[in-house]
Every structure is written in structure tokens, then in C-alpha cells.
From Swiss-Prot:
Protein source organism: Daucus carota (Wild carrot)
This protein's name: Bifunctional dihydrofolate reductase-thymidylate synthase
Bridged cysteine pairs (disulfide): none
Gene Ontology CC: cytosol; mitochondrion
InterPro entries: DHFR-like_dom_sf (IPR024072), DHFR-TS (IPR012262), DHFR_CS (IPR017925), DHFR_dom (IPR001796), Thymidate_synth/dCMP_Mease (IPR045097), Thymidate_synth/dCMP_Mease_dom (IPR023451), Thymidate_synth/dCMP_Mease_sf (IPR036926), Thymidylate_synthase (IPR000398)
Binding site for substrate: 27, 49, 136, 142, 157
Every DHFR domain range: 23-200
């Protein structure tokens, strides 16, 4: 029954969703304290919001179908007469007033409640002719529908300014909804705002427990934890804005249009030159979902870089073996570092970040006070001179390249402060799209979040600029499967639990992911 969609979401097991008659999506604009109107009107003028509303509620995948919009009587009356009914959509008006008679108006139907509206739309002819159902107001309708089990998604224009309102709706229950997509901030008529779509991923807070994993463990994800596995019910214009499609589209472009090249490892690659991806860190964390990313490895390696260590054995002792190949006896001998102890990687990333210019001897030496500490310099400039255009950290030191087990691939980062937000652009000269790039995206997004935390800022953008973006020939079939067949899920949310403001005080347990439910791990061999 449709009434189940507006009632208790469970059937006794705590996680099983009732068989819906008709679900719906909510479209709303609201301030940070969920104000939506004043004196029966919108207290802001945002033409782009009107366009967004039209695009979301009118878009259908089947040109022979249309969408339905459910609204209360006051919302109907607030629409200018010349725009009533909203064109191209079935207008469902909720009212219990016997004097309200518009039944003769084309493309308009009247229902007494949300329950009766959903039941109507579940029956003939609307079950066939109506593709999606959107709830568009007003306050009482939103309060009834927003967090109810029948709500699959919420498309919200999030207004960051304080604007006086007299009508409010409940906060979105973020224990069961996660961001699918959030636009970069826009400013219109001096109002800063963004468009964010949240999707329902679970029915109850109880399900959240199994989704919340600290990085101290890397247990297998249970794909059954997410009630919804396929989010293609979203309007196409929203569905395709998921930021994972930046990565998937780049992989697809390389496979389809790349140039075949030889490489140092003699594996062979298909590559393109010069590309960029931009990720929004404000609402979610860009840990790819079409294949499982080794999150614990991301965290431990970044903390290892920050410590300035060049000893691969430290990572290996923690079960992180990503540097084992480049630190092996066989590999070090093959590049002429025959006197180097196994596991000693030379003056690579962490050394350059913390001791740039110091003379490298071996991984056991104490380099305290030696060289230039770029990381602390970055933090100092962000705190004391945030408008500086020289907030830069470089791992590329030409005089040390011959001493490194592997010259830096991700070699240069610049930080930028605006509107209380910290953004980072990283340049990567060589990008292994299969194994390296998912790791690199997560690592620099995490670094940005950590520095923002230390500097009392919030994360902004992570911009990933790539020189040679390539797919190794032995990864082609696996990445073809990922980029052409897998559908992304929601990115997780990152919580930093530490109250520490010292970049060197973080521990792996300080970072918690909420709602990471990726597809299965894809085994790919690393080219050494």
C-alpha cells in the first residue's frame, strides 16, 4: 500500500523496505537552517535555481512519458497564473477543500493526501504514462514527505546565506541519505548556493553501523548493506554528474582514442596527454566505487609521506605492500642502486616534502632540522598569508632523481584559500589509471582535508591535472569492465575525529569513512 511509504520503513527485520507502490523524489530550495519561504513566497531570486527545477522535473528518459509534480494548494496558488499548470508535467494538487475545483484543467488532478496521490499515480493510466514523481512543496507536504521511506532522492538548492524565513522543513536524515552529486558553489544576486542531490542508501540508522569503517581495518564491504544498488532512477542530467564519471570517462577516452606507446616497464601502454579532473570535497570524499580502493593503504601511505620516511619496511609491517616491488633487492640492483639496503627507497616524496635540499644518506639517518620543510611552510602560509600565490609543495628535485627508487609521479601541489575553504591542485606527470590514479585522487583529497582541519578551514576543491595519462596493456580488459559496465555508487563521507591541529599528530584511527560500499576489488598487476 502507498501508506507504507509514509509510515515505518521496516517490516520487523530493521532493514527490509516494503514493496513500494510509487516512490518519489523531493525538489526544494532551503537555507542552512532549512528555511524555505517567507509570507508564502521564495525570499530569494535565483534564476539558475528555476532552471535547475525545470530541468530536473521535466527530464525523462522516455520521450513518450512525462513526470508528475505533487504540490499543496498554497504552492499551486503561488505559481503565477500564466505558468499554471506547470507545462510538460502532470500537476497533482493536494487539497481537502471542497471548494477547490480545477478538475477541468488539463494536466491537473486533485488528491486529498500524499497517500492518495501515490496510489493514484501507481494505478492506470499513470503507472505507464508517468516516469518519475517529484514532490515540490509546500512546507506541510515537505514535512510529511522529506524523510519518509518512499523518498528515493532529495534535490536541494542549498543556500549558504542567512535569509529570513517563516516556513521551515526538517533537516535531511543524513544517516540514511548520502550525497550523489553537489555542484561547485555559485553566486547569483549576491547569494552563494549550490545544487546537491542526496539519495537514499539505507532505511535505518542500524544499517549505518556496518557502513562505518575506520581505516584501522579494511574488512570486505558487504554490498548488501546498501538497500539501493542502482541509482539510475535519478534524472539523467543528475545521474551523469556523479564525479566518478570524470574518472570513468577519462579511462574510456584513453582506451578508445589513446596512442599505443612503449614504457620503462616494457609492459606497454595506451595513453593520452594533458587532462584534468575536478572533485568537490565539500559534501563527500572522492573514493572511487566502481572498484574497491585500498583505503587503509591510502591513509597509511600518506601518514608515512608526512612523517618523511623513506623506509618501505615500515609500510610492509602494517600490511601495506604497495612499495615492496620498487624496494626489492632485485629492483634496486636493476637501476644501479646496488649499495642501497633493501626497502630503502631513497629521497622520494616524504623526504622532499619535509627535507628538500638535504643530503640523503640512507633511510636510517636522522634528518631533523635538515633541508627545507615544505609541508610546514605550506601550513604556515595558509594560516598567515592565505592570499599567497606561492603555497606550493614539490616532490620533484632534479638533483636527487638518480637516488630515488622511483622518480615522483605526483610531483607538484599548489594550495588556494577562498571563502574559508582550502583547495588543492596537484600535477601528476605520469598516471597509471588502473592502480595509481584512484589511490592518488584519494590521497591528495585526504591531504587537503587534513591541512584544512589543521588550519581551521573546510575542504573545497581538489583539481587533478595529469600529463601522461595511461592504461597499461595488461589492465585494458579490467578497466574496460569498470568504465563501460559498472555504475557508480555514492561517494562516502569522511570524518576526521582528531582534535589535534598538528599535522604530525594524526593517526590512522583518526579517519573514518561513512557509507563506503564499492563494487568488488579488481586485481591488477603493478608494472615495476
Amino acid at each position: 500500500m502507498a501508506s507504507e511509504l509514509l509510515a515505518n520503513p521496516t517490516n520487523g527485520s530493521g532493514i527490509t523496505r516494503p514493496d513500494p507502490q510509487r516512490t518519489y523524489q523531493v525538489v526544494v530550495a532551503a537555507t542552512q537552517n532549512m528555511g524555505i519561504g517567507k509570507d508564502g513566497k521564495l525570499p530569494w531570486r535565483l534564476p539558475s535555481d528555476m532552471k535547475f527545477f525545470k530541468d530536473v522535473t521535466m527530464t525523462t528518459s522516455d520521450p513518450l512519458k512525462r513526470n508528475a509534480v505533487i504540490m499543496g494548494r498554497k504552492t499551486w496558488e503561488s505559481i503565477p497564473i500564466q505558468h499554471r499548470p506547470l507545462p510538460g508535467r502532470l500537476n497533482v494538487v493536494l487539497t481537502r477543500s471542497g471548494s477547490f475545483d480545477i478538475a477541468t484543467v488539463e494536466n491537473v488532478v486533485i488528491c486529498g493526501s500524499m497517500i492518495s496521490a501515490l496510489e493514484l499515480l501507481a494505478g492506470s493510466p499513470y503507472c505507464v504514462s508517468v516516469e518519475k514523481v517529484f514532490v515540490i512543496g509546500g512546507g506541510q507536504i515537505y514535512r510529511e514527505a522529506l524523510n519518509a521511506p518512499g523518498c528515493d532522492a532529495v534535490h536541494i538548492t542549498e543556500i549558504e546565506e542567512h535569509i529570513e524565513c517563516d516556513t521551515f522543513i526538517p533537516l535531511l536524515d543524513e544517516s540514511v541519505f548520502q550525497p550523489w552529486y553537489s555542484s561547485f558553489p555559485l553566486v547569483e544576486n549576491k547569494i552563494r548556493y549550490c545544487f546537491t542531490t542526496y539519495v537514499r542508501v539505507r532505511n535505518s540508522v542500524a544499517e549505518l553501523t556496518s557502513q562505518t569503517n575506520g581505516c584501522s581495518s579494511d574488512s570486505k564491504s558487504d554490498s548488501g548493506n546498501f538497500e539501493i544498488q542502482n541509482f539510475s532512477f535519478l534524472p539523467k542530467t543528475v545521474f551523469e554528474k556523479h564525479e566518478e564519471y570524470l574518472y570513468l570517462g577519462l579511462v574510456e577516452n584513453i582506451i578508445s582514442n589513446g596512442v599505443t606507446k612503449n614504457d620503462r616497464t616494457r609492459t606497454g601502454t595506451v595513453s593520452i596527454f594533458g587532462c584534468q579532473m575536478r572533485f568537490n570535497l565539500r559534501k563527500s570524499f572522492p573514493l572511487l566505487t566502481t572498484k574497491k580502493v585500498f583505503w587503509r593503504g591510502v591513509v597509511e601511505e600518506l601518514l608515512w609521506f608526512i612523517s618523511g620516511s623513506t623506509n618501505a619496511k615500515i609500510l610492509k609491517e602494517k600490511g601495506v605492500n604497495i612499495w615492496e616491488g620498487n624496494g626489492s633487492r632485485e629492483y634496486l640492483d636493476s637501476i644501479g642502486l646496488t649499495d642501497r639496503e633493501e626497502g630503502d627507497l631513497g629521497p622520494i616524496y616524504g623526504f622532499q616534502w619535509r627535507h628538500f635540499g638535504a643530503r640523503y644518506t640512507d633511510m636510517h639517518a636522522d634528518y631533523s632540522g635538515q633541508g627545507f620543510d615544505q609541508l610546514l611552510d605550506v601550513i604556515s602560509k595558509i594560516k598567515n598569508n592565505p592570499d599567497d600565490r606561492r603555497i606550493i609543495q614539490s616532490a620533484w628535485n632534479p638533483s636527487d632523481l638518480r637516488l630515488m627508487a622511483l622518480p615522483p609521479c605526483h610531483m607538484f601541489a599548489q594550495f588556494y584559500v577562498a571563502n574559508g575553504e582550502l583547495s588543492c591542485q596537484m600535477y601528476q606527470r605520469s598516471a597509471d589509471m588502473g592502480l595509481g590514479v584512484p589511490f592518488n585522487i584519494a590521497a591528495y583529497a585526504l591531504l587537503t582535508c587534513m591541512i584544512a582541519h589543521v588550519c581551521d578551514l573546510v575542504p573545497g576543491d581538489f583539481v587533478h591535472s595529469i600529463g601522461d595519462a595511461h592504461v597499461y596493456s595488461n589492465h585494458l580488459s579490467d578497466l574496460f569492465e569498470t568504465s563501460f559496465r559498472m555504475l557508480p555508487k555514492t561517494f562516502p563521507v569522511l570524518k576526521i575525529n582528531s582534535g589535534e591541529k598538528d599535522i604530525d599528530s594524526f593517526e590512522a584511527a583518526d579517519f573514518k569513512l561513512i557509507g563506503y560500499d564499492p563494487h568488488q576489488k579488481i586485481e591488477m598487476k603493478m608494472a615495476v
